[in-house]
Amino acid sequence: MNAAVVRMAEAVTDSWFGHHISGRIELPLSALAAIAWHGPEPEHAPGATTEMLGWDTDHTLGYIRSQWRRFGRLRPDLANPAAPFLLAWLGDTPLTEREEKAVHAVVRAALRANLFSLTLPDARFDVDLFGVTLTLLKAGGANKAGAAYYTPSHIADVMARILGLTDEASIHEPACGTGGLLRAAAALMRDRGRDPHTVEWVAVDIDELAIACLAANVIIWDLGYQVLLGVADVLTEHWIPKARKMRAETITVALEAERARRVLDAVIALENPTPEPEAATSGAPASPTPMEKESL
């Protein structure tokens, strides 16, 4: 098991429970996802960490909300499996003041535990940020979790090689947890020159938070757009047709909403034309900072 991931997960968990909060563990998990998606380039990671550690609570929470809003726009196909996280930030239940402070502390704890070292381009495909973190949060802390972890990364890597998953047109995982075996299969594909975007990833678990974590991991691991995730008991439910229908309906609604937004933007632009900008007087505009770049 990756020691750096365990340290980060323990830091997040200790910070959350240190604020005497026992419920709504979707908040620290979704906050971790939103920050992890930022994934600055190696040369920018120290500066990004320092900058984000300087953010106050309102700035941090605003950034997390903006990340989940962007996720909903860019990946409506994952909106249903990610619903616990999306609703945590964009739903009707506001965070309490204690929860807001706890989320801010969680983000700072993850950053101090070198979160961005785990999301660099040469590292992000080899780790699962959520398996250990979810286990510890569900157990109530590191001292209570025992050995109830999801499949460790090195075991998943071995299983992927044994199962020979690199030549499949689709990969099905009927008890996926946070997606460790999918990560291993995708990493093995890359090692052998195959693009994981060419595969359909089909995964289900009975735990809705594990599936929400996997939806976040789809972005971190860059699994592409052929992804079908579901929350169901595979022993009693025929979940795939239902999941395909829900995904299609959500994408349709998202496309209609996007078209409506563009029409509204066009109407506003016609009613309030933007004046022509004055000629620049001091050279080229500054390049965007790492924090201003698209994260997903």
Identify the residue ranges that each predicted region occupies.
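Alpha-helix C-capping/helix-to-loop hinge sites
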Residues: 15, 117, 136, 140-143, ...
